[in-house]
């Protein structure tokens, strides 16, 4: 892509971003990101979070999802969050900065969870996008497979999993894998998710 084309594309993205009603609402409310609204929509339909729960947040930065969940689980709840990027502190959130794909980071995350099981694992992870689906989709699928492995390790029976997935090669197989592990599985496309985006959210409840 030439610099001129890239500049035009970036300008269009910025224009779309700042005219987005959810971006504007997030700024007015002092929220960390528009992702807050996506999780709010999912919570309204699926009732994943309750006071006192322990929740794992993968791909947490800048903190929109953790910021939302804190309001749902209260002071007795706990969030263990992880991201490659830094994240400003949130009261009630135990944040680990590191690459989730790294075995040592995964080990450190499991140590923070401890022996007790968690009630919800949520993943908003995504790779750095190149714009080429043949490259981006496999990278994204690798991350969501790791998130599902995390569920196998730490999620309590009856627990829930919400994960951002990009539709493309491997999506149907991944959905089948989740259906084998949970009693109820829904695919959600929140209104606050941009229409042109390939992203959807798989909401799985009732860990078998």
Swiss-Prot record:
Pfam families: FtsJ. InterPro entries: RNA_methyltr_RlmE, RNA_MeTrfase_FtsJ_dom, rRNA-MeTfrase_E, rRNA_MeTrfase_gammaproteobac, SAM-dependent_MTases_sf. Its EC number is 2.1.1.166. One of its GO terms (biological process) is RNA methylation. The keyword rRNA processing applies. Keywords: Cytoplasm, Methyltransferase, rRNA processing, S-adenosyl-L-methionine, Transferase. It comes from the Bacteria. It catalyses: uridine(2552) in 23S rRNA + S-adenosyl-L-methionine = 2'-O-methyluridine(2552) in 23S rRNA + S-adenosyl-L-homocysteine + H(+). It is found in: Cytoplasm. Its main location: cytoplasm. One of its GO terms (cellular component) is cytoplasm. Specifically methylates the uridine in position 2552 of 23S rRNA at the 2'-O position of the ribose in the fully assembled 50S ribosomal subunit. Belongs to the class I-like SAM-binding methyltransferase superfamily. RNA methyltransferase RlmE family. This is Ribosomal RNA large subunit methyltransferase E.
């Amino acid at each position: 892509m030439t610099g001129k084309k890239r500049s035009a594309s970036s300008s269009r993205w910025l224009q779309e971003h700042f005219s987005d009603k959810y971006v504007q609402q997030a700024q007015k409310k002092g929220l960390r990101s528009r992702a807050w609204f996506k999780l709010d929509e999912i919570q309204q339909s699926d009732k994943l979070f309750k006071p006192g729960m322990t929740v794992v947040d993968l791909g947490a930065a800048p903190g929109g999802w953790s910021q939302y969940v804190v309001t749902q689980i209260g002071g007795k709840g706990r969030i263990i969050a992880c991201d490659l990027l830094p994240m400003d502190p949130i009261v009630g959130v135990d944040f680990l900065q590191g690459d989730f794909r790294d075995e040592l980071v995964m080990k450190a995350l499991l140590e923070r969870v401890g022996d007790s099981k968690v009630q919800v694992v949520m993943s908003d992870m995504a790779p750095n996008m190149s714009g080429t689906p043949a490259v981006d989709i496999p990278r994204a699928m690798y991350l969501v497979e790791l998130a599902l492995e995390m569920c196998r390790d730490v999620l309590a029976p009856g627990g829930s999993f919400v994960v951002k997935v990009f539709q493309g090669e491997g999506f149907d197989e991944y959905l089948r894998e989740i259906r084998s592990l949970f009693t109820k599985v829904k695919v959600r496309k929140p209104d606050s998710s941009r229409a042109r985006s390939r992203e959807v959210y798989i909401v799985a409840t009732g860990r078998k």
